[in-house]
C-alpha cells in the first residue's frame, strides 16, 4: 500500500524490525 502516511508507518516498522533483529542476535549470542 503506497500512501503518504505510509512514511511514518514504514519508519516505525523499520525501528521495530531493528529491535527484533537485535533480540535475535542477542538470543544467538
Curated annotation (Swiss-Prot):
- Keywords, sorted A to Z: Chloride, Chloride channel, Ion channel, Ion transport, Membrane, Phosphoprotein, Transmembrane, Transport
Protein topology in the membrane: Single-pass type I membrane protein
**Keyword check for Cell membrane:** no
The record describes its post-translational modification as:
Phosphorylated by protein kinase C.
The record's subcellular location field reads: Membrane
Q: What GO molecular function annotations does the UniProt record carry, in alphabetical order?
A: chloride channel activity
**Disulfide linkage:** none
- One Gene Ontology term, aspect cellular component: chloride channel complex
Name the family: Belongs to the FXYD family.
Q: What does the function comment of this entry state?
A: Induces a hyperpolarization-activated chloride current when expressed in Xenopus oocytes.
Instruction: Return the protein name.
Output: Phospholemman-like protein
Q: Which organism is it from?
A: Scyliorhinus canicula
Amino acid at each position: 500500500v503506497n500512501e503518504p502516511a505510509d512514511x511514518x508507518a514504514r519508519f516505525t516498522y523499520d525501528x521495530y524490525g531493528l529491535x527484533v533483529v537485535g533480540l535475535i542476535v542477542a538470543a544467538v549470542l
